[in-house]
Amino acid sequence: MTSNPSSSADQPLSGTTVPGSVPGKAPEEPPVKFTRAAAVWSALIVGFLILILLLIFIAQNTASAQFAFFGWRWSLPLGVAILLAAVGGGLITVFAGTARILQLRRAAKKTHAAALR
């Protein structure tokens, strides 16, 4: 029995290792797999955060703005007008992306059919 609390009998000696372990190396954990479900949940969370920010933006920009297009004239709240412009831009992007995917799919089918001959 000593008066030094750091050298108690309950603590292992500093140079000892646990049987079956490699000294100085932490046990490896298996890598986390990337799944489609994880991607969907991540996209949903990001989408909801963007939606919340968009709703705050629309609520803060309620001043009416005048618009004219090919002789038509109307007024909308500024936040709603910007939302409609963003939705229109997104739809144009979707249509362009769909056309490109169909184009690539058609080319891949031709290449696959030519390879089978």
Swiss-Prot record:
It comes from the Bacteria. Disulfide bonds: none annotated. InterPro entries: LapA_dom. One of its GO terms (cellular component) is plasma membrane. Residues 1-19 have a biased composition (Polar residues). Its main location: membrane. It is found in: Cell membrane. It is a multi-pass membrane protein. Keywords: Cell membrane, Membrane, Transmembrane, Transmembrane helix. The chain crosses the membrane at residues 38-58, 76-96. Coiled coil: none annotated. This is Uncharacterized membrane protein Rv3760. It comes from Mycobacterium tuberculosis (strain ATCC 25618 / H37Rv).
